[in-house]
Amino acid sequence: LLGLIEGVNIRNSNMLVASDFLFISLVVFNLFGNCEKYLYGYGKYELLRYKKRTLILGKIILKSFLSVCVFCLTRIIIYAFLLFIRNEKIIDFTVADISNYIFTSILSLFFISILQTLVELKFSSFAGVITAFSYYIVSTILGGYFIEKEQYFPLLFLTTNFSMKNRTDLISADFVDLYILYLI
């Protein structure tokens, strides 16, 4: 379990943090304004047709989860393609490592998207985006601090280090570092 929560020392991997931030910004901006169309648009008419509010919220959460899954699978395909170009073995990890990476990556991005959705429901879309980005930045900085101090328990509450754990071996090569910022 300690190998799962160790995370990545972000001070040595600036390209990893930049590529992960670009990917999270894709997810956040894809979900931008997702709740406003239900609050101020045709959501009023669905409520008038005797649809439940929980059903509408379920639609919003399902759309959020599906978009996170699509973006995560797209990222995995891009990484596999870059490794194929370099003629490296794609399956250097065990199946448990790969499934652990996929599961934690989807969960961390889903948490950020749910955080954005809840803030959008209460305040505005801009407040949701600012909250999601600030949570990601604070979580990444605190994750690096806790790794330096070798305090692994607080990392359980910081989701971004979960998603970056198993990717360091995949994108640490020089060839991939040049293109990772533009592709992901």
PLM features per residue range, with description:
Residues 52-54, 124-129:
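Membrane-helix interface segments
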